[in-house]
C-alpha cells in the first residue's frame, strides 16, 4: 500500500473535510470546491488524514510542508543515533588511589558525551556483601554528578552489580569550554625527569 501523500488532483474522493490555510475548520465540502479554494489562494490541497471518513485535507504550501517534514525526520534520526557506551570495572574493596583513577576515566567518558556502564566485580565471599557494591556505585554517582547522572540505578547482574551513567546534555561543549586547546584525549603527558634538562646559565 502506497504511503505517498496525495496532493491536489491526486485526491480522488467525492468530498473532504477541509482545513483552511490558517488552521480553521471549514467543514465537509466537495472535492471540486476544495480544489478551487486552494487554487484561488495559490496553495495546494494536501491530504493529511487519508484514513478518516471523509479524508481530511488542508490548504497549504506543499513544498514548504515537505521541506519541514524532511527536516524533522533528519532531526529525529540524529536523536536516535546510538550513544557510545563505555565500561568501567571496579572491585568492591577498591583503595582510594585506584578509585580516583577510575573516577577520572568515568569523568572523561562523560565529558566526551559517552554513557558509562559501571560494573562492580564480586569475588568469593564478597558476593555475600552486595551493600559494598551498592555504596560504591552511589558514591561514584554523587562524585561525578557535575558531569552526568544515574540513568539506570544499581542492580545485581549475576555475580556483578551494574549502574549506567549518562552525560548531561551539552557535555562535549562544556568540556571544550573548560579545557580550550586541549586535545580530545585529555591533557598532554607531563615530562619525566629524563626528558628535562637543566637550562644553561
Curated annotation (Swiss-Prot):
Subcellular location, record wording: Cytoplasm
Cytoplasm among keywords: yes
Biological processes annotated in GO: ribosome disassembly
A Pfam family this chain is assigned to: IF3_C
SUPFAM superfamilies: Translation initiation factor IF3, C-terminal domain, Translation initiation factor IF3, N-terminal domain
Keywords: Cytoplasm, Initiation factor, Protein biosynthesis
Source taxon at top rank: Bacteria
Gene Ontology MF annotations: ribosome binding; translation initiation factor activity
One Gene Ontology cellular component annotation held by this UniProt entry: cytosol
Biased composition (Basic residues): 169-178
PROSITE patterns membership: IF3 (PS00938)
Protein family per UniProt: Belongs to the IF-3 family.
Complex and partners: Monomer.
Role description: IF-3 binds to the 30S ribosomal subunit and shifts the equilibrium between 70S ribosomes and their 50S and 30S subunits in favor of the free subunits, thus enhancing the availability of 30S subunits on which protein synthesis initiation begins.
NCBIfam families cross-referenced by the UniProt entry: infC
Record-given protein name: Translation initiation factor IF-3
Organism: Mycobacterium bovis (strain ATCC BAA-935 / AF2122/97)
This protein's encoding gene: infC
Amino acid at each position: 500500500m502506497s504511503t505517498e501523500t496525495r496532493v491536489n488532483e491526486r485526491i480522488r474522493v467525492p468530498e473532504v473535510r477541509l482545513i483552511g490555510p490558517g488552521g480553521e475548520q471549514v467543514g465537509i465540502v466537495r472535492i471540486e470546491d476544495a480544489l478551487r479554494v486552494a487554487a484561488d489562494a495559490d496553495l495546494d490541497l494536501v491530504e493529511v488524514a487519508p484514513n478518516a471518513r471523509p479524508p481530511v485535507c488542508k490548504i497549504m504550501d506543499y513544498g514548504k510542508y515537505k521541506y519541514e517534514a524532511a527536516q524533522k525526520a533528519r532531526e529525529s534520526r540524529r536523536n536516535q543515533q546510538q550513544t557510545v557506551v563505555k565500561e568501567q570495572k571496579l572491585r568492591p574493596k577498591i583503595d582510594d588511589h585506584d578509585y580516583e583513577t577510575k573516577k577520572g576515566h568515568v569523568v572523561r567518558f562523560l565529558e566526551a558525551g559517552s554513557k558509562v556502564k559501571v560494573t562492580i566485580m564480586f569475588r568469593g565471599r564478597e558476593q555475600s556483601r552486595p551493600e559494598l557494591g551498592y555504596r560504591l556505585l552511589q558514591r561514584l554517582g554523587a562524585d561525578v554528578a557535575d558531569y552526568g547522572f544515574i540513568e539506570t540505578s544499581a542492580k545485581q547482574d549475576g555475580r556483578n552489580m551494574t549502574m549506567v551513567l549518562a552525560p548531561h546534555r551539552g557535555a562535549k561543549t562544556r568540556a571544550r569550554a573548560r579545557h580550550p586547546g586541549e586535545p580530545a584525549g585529555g591533557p598532554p603527558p607531563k615530562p619525566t625527569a629524563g626528558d628535562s634538562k637543566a637550562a644553561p646559565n
